[in-house]
Amino acid sequence: MLEAKNLTCIRDDRCLFQQLSFCIAPGEIVQIEGPNGAGKTSLLRILAGLAEADEGQVNWRDKNIRRDRAKYHQDLLFLGHQPGIKSVLTPFENLLFYQSVFQKVDSAAIWQALAQVGLVGYEDLPVSQLSAGQQRRVALARLWLSPAPLWILDEPLTAIDKQGVSTLLALFVQHAAKGGMVLLTTHQDLGAVSHNVRKICLANTQEKSCLSACCAVN
């Protein structure tokens, strides 16, 4: 279980959220909602252990993630705004490298992941020669290879066509059905997802005081 405990985040003298607490249990899909500037990306980075909260802590399986960040990151797949892939490598080589870090290499699984994101035929091109959208799809292909139980995804559906969105949403449902956890931000309507999606809404009136920030959990 992932637990956010009394998290407060202040950026540029502005409080994005204050005393925010919630838990995510195995089998859940959770969407972080809120207007631009409400702190959605900051929250995801804090939960992923890539940024520090001004107050509070993040627990994974009842332990503060600061105690063993490396072990926590073995259980986590984080996809941010940047693809996080190596531009000098090809899509196939990027996925091969990613897979080799966590598990035994399975070339067939890599080919299947490339097929799922529509990159068969581009597997031998350096990533630097691909469009921004194609680079994004290389990053998303890691979802089909990841053994991590916790997925934290910042706008994973951006610049993805309708069929691609449907494919990704089906994968999220499949991951949750196996006991995984999916935490994401998106501007897409998830009403059609065949799985209960819990929503955490961050609201911020853009005032300087922390008292102006609030959070509602649906």
From Swiss-Prot:
Q: Which residue ranges does the record assign to the ABC transporter domain?
A: 2-217
Identify the enzyme class: translocase
Q: Which InterPro entries match?
A: AAA+_ATPase (IPR003593), ABC_transporter-like_ATP-bd (IPR003439), ABC_transporter-like_CS (IPR017871), ABC_transptr_haem_export_CcmA (IPR005895), P-loop_NTPase (IPR027417)
One of the protein's GO biological processes: cytochrome complex assembly
- Which of this chain's residues are annotated to bind ATP? G34, P35, N36, G37, A38, G39, K40, T41
Q: What is its main location?
A: membrane
List, alphabetically, the SUPFAM superfamilies matched. Answer: P-loop containing nucleoside triphosphate hydrolases
Q: Which UniProt keywords apply?
A: ATP-binding, Cell inner membrane, Cell membrane, Cytochrome c-type biogenesis, Membrane, Nucleotide-binding, Translocase, Transport
* Superkingdom assignment: Bacteria
- PROSITE patterns, alphabetized: ABC_TRANSPORTER_1 (PS00211), ABC_TRANSPORTER_2 (PS50893), CCMA (PS51243)
The compartments listed are:
Cell inner membrane
Give the record's membrane topology.
Answer: Peripheral membrane protein
Indicate the quaternary assembly: The complex is composed of two ATP-binding proteins (CcmA) and two transmembrane proteins (CcmB).
What does the similarity note say? Belongs to the ABC transporter superfamily. CcmA exporter (TC 3.A.1.107) family.
| UniProt protein name | Cytochrome c biogenesis ATP-binding export protein CcmA
State the species of origin: Yersinia pestis
